[in-house]
Amino acid sequence: MDEDGGGEGGGVPEDLSLEEREELLDIRRRKKELIDDIERLKYEIAEVMTEIDNLTSVEESKTTQRNKQIAMGRKKFNMDPKKGIQFLIENDLLQSSPEDVAQFLYKGEGLNKTVIGDYLGERDEFNIKVLQAFVELHEFADLNLVQALRQFLWSFRLPGEAQKIDRMMEAFASRYCLCNPGVFQSTDTCYVLSFAIIMLNTSLHNHNVRDKPTAERFIAMNRGINEGGDLPEELLRNLYESIKNEPFKIPEDDGNDLTHTFFNPDREGWLLKLGGGRVKTWKRRWFILTDNCLYYFEYTTDKEPRGIIPLENLSIREVEDPRKPNCFELYNPSHKGQVIKACKTEADGRVVEGNHVVYRISAPSPEEKEEWMKSIKASISRDPFYDMLATRKRRIANKK
């Protein structure tokens, strides 16, 4: 074979001219270069794809880590709201503005609604700004007052402290009036009527309230609250019927089905109660203090109380007992030796009058005894909710 017949890509036909041979060899050389380039590009693409896979893994890892931190932040919030918010801000999971914190609470995913309520009710300047931003996330336009309250009271659980409730309901009333101009003469009117509706809900759907308020009584109770004038009777009747037909749905965080009867208790917890029968035995009961009554249950999940002690006309005192520590008593200071007006449920379901001259109760610790005595004294002496309403009604009356 001719020496020119060798080279890249095999032999060259002998019948080609020198010029054609050179052109063919040039084509073969460029083909090889292209094949080499393609192989190099394949290698580079493979490297890039590997880098992309690594980056994706890193991003997924970051997302997983972020989700874990958010979940941790929610848990911290449910245990201590201020520390939970601080943790989320420090880890760049939440901006430090009141608006961002309000949005986080409003979404509420994985958050305890009782804790949300306590946090929003705090009087720190930042918390007040968060409350304002939180309320502004609610759209109440074209809703009647009951519809707006349903939406508002589902987004958190009202705290038990009167001052906290006052701030939150004041913010609600201002927002409702802003969204619905002309419905009420003032935010005070909206505030007073909102409380009247909440109390109506409790009265209508509390199994222990025998004398259920009628629409006429509800209308009469709210006369003169609109800057001295009356609200339209049709409006009040519609609000009454709405609550009568469907009670408020209150968020339940503890699994107990007590929300209709025991709306925002002043205090609740386990205590020991000395029996009133011939054989005096101590029994552990779950106590709930609300609406100037002390209710006790056998279990936290019971729907009906085992006993009800109205606190009207009673007093409370600390006592020593040789068998149990941290004791206090409820007694009637005006009629010593007289059986206290109360009722209890027997094992067969019958409701009978109590037979206690005094109710002796033992708390788990000295601190809890002091807290219970303080709460019961406050409940006996005055109801802060009625104080707040009385203040608003006086303010309305003074505007006449």
Curated annotation (Swiss-Prot):
A 1,2-diacyl-sn-glycero-3-phospho-(1D-myo-inositol-3,4,5-trisphosphate) binds at K273, L274, G275, G276, G277, R278, V279, K280, T281, R285, Y296, R306, N355. Residues 14-61 form a coiled coil. One of its GO terms (cellular component) is plasma membrane. Residues 264-381 form the PH domain. Gene3D superfamilies: 1.10.220.20, Arf Nucleotide-binding Site Opener,domain 2, Pleckstrin-homology domain (PH domain)/Phosphotyrosine-binding domain (PTB). SMART domains: PH (SM00233), Sec7 (SM00222). GO terms for molecular function: guanyl-nucleotide exchange factor activity; phosphatidylinositol-3,4,5-trisphosphate binding. Residues 392-400 are annotated as: C-terminal autoinhibitory region. PROSITE patterns: PH_DOMAIN, SEC7. GO terms for biological process: establishment of epithelial cell polarity; Golgi vesicle transport; positive regulation of cell adhesion; regulation of ARF protein signal transduction. Transmembrane segments: none annotated. Almost absent from liver, thymus and peripheral blood lymphocytes. Pfam families: PH, Sec7. It is a peripheral membrane protein. It comes from the Eukaryota. The keyword Cell membrane applies. InterPro entries: PH-like_dom_sf (IPR011993), PH_domain (IPR001849), Sec7_C_sf (IPR023394), Sec7_dom (IPR000904), Sec7_dom_sf (IPR035999). Residues 77-206 form the SEC7 domain. It is found in: Cytoplasm, Cytosol; Cell membrane; Cell junction, Adherens junction; Cell junction, Tight junction. Its main location: cytoplasm. Keywords: Cell junction, Cell membrane, Coiled coil, Cytoplasm, Guanine-nucleotide releasing factor, Lipid-binding, Membrane, Tight junction. Promotes guanine-nucleotide exchange on ARF1 and ARF6. Promotes the activation of ARF factors through replacement of GDP with GTP. Plays a role in the epithelial polarization. Binds via its PH domain to the inositol head group of phosphatidylinositol 3,4,5-trisphosphate. Interacts with TAMALIN. Interacts with ARF6. Interacts with FRMD4A. Interacts with FRMD4B. This is Cytohesin-3. It comes from Homo sapiens. The gene is CYTH3.
